[in-house]
């Protein structure tokens, strides 16, 4: 039972660190948001993959943040 508690302790600490790590992706999130907003504005040209470059940058940043969280690094 104590081993199970140790596992949950590690999981909780990783989950607590995750929002801080995602905060480092603010520039990517803002760029993606601007792209989506521009494409849905009047006269915008919303189409599949229109913001793919911005989305990929955001996804990569989130993946890097998740990896750091799982590794327990800074």
UniProtKB/Swiss-Prot annotation:
GO CC annotations, alphabetized: mitochondrial matrix; mitochondrion
Outcome (variant: residue 55 to L): In MC1DN34; uncertain significance
Presence of keyword Hydrolase: no
Motif (Cx9C motif 1): 25-35
Location in the cell: Mitochondrion
Residue ranges of domain CHCH in the record: 22-69
Disulfide pattern: 25-61, 35-51
Biological processes per GO annotation: mitochondrial respiratory chain complex I assembly
Superkingdom of the organism of origin: Eukaryota
Motif range (Cx9C motif 2): 51-61
PANTHER family to which the protein is assigned, alphabetical: NADH DEHYDROGENASE [UBIQUINONE] 1 ALPHA SUBCOMPLEX ASSEMBLY FACTOR 8
Record disease entry: Mitochondrial complex I deficiency, nuclear type 34: A form of mitochondrial complex I deficiency, the most common biochemical signature of mitochondrial disorders, a group of highly heterogeneous conditions characterized by defective oxidative phosphorylation, which collectively affects 1 in 5-10000 live births. Clinical disorders have variable severity, ranging from lethal neonatal disease to adult-onset neurodegenerative disorders.
Function text: Involved in the assembly of mitochondrial NADH:ubiquinone oxidoreductase complex (complex I, MT-ND1). Required to stabilize NDUFAF5.
Name recorded for this polypeptide: NADH dehydrogenase [ubiquinone] 1 alpha subcomplex assembly factor 8
Organism: Homo sapiens
